[in-house]
Amino acid sequence: MSPTPVPDAEPARADAPAGPFQTRAGAYALIVDGGRVLLSSWQGPEHLVWTLPGGGIELGESPEEACLREVWEETGHTAELTGLLGVTTGTIPAEKRLRGEPLPLLTVQVLYTARITGGVLRPEVGGSSTDARWFDLAELSGLRTASWVTEALARAGVAA
């Protein structure tokens, strides 16, 4: 199965139509340990998608703070950021927005590497993710994953 953007985001293009749009910035952690990667799931409008632990950056919060908070919320683990992999972008057309939003959405994902420092694996309670799980890297080809999972693994030089 090929990577699927969340939710059905398309890569940003220089020839994208001009006009008003909204922006959502998020921060995500690639956590690899012993040939396994930690992922959290998100129920999209059409299917379940596995993604890196992470999510939206709140007002007044740094990307680093958001990333660590989201890892805790979605997985039950505390973590330490170990590196910056880079930034990716995508576009979700207005007609594919979740709650019928009238404007397209530019998504910006800040990607980090991290390592677990504590906590116990558990799914998020009352949040946007539905599960958290370690996967062997070899299992990833059979999963529906967000596009930035593949991007983060490639940037980190980790073969899936």
Where are these regions (language model features)?
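A short coil-to-beta-strand element that immediately follows conserved catalytic motifs
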Residues: 78-87
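Conserved Nudix-box catalytic region and its N-terminal flanking loop in Nudix hydrolases
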Residues: 33-77
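Active-site-adjacent beta-strand/loop module that shapes the phosphate/pyrophosphate-binding cleft
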Residues: 89-121
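Short connector loops at helix/strand junctions that flank enzyme active sites
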Residues: 24, 32, 45, 52, ...
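Acidic, metal-coordinating catalytic segment for phosphate/diphosphate chemistry
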Residues: 1-30, 101-102
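Short, well-ordered beta-strand micro-motif
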Residues: 31, 111-115, 134-136
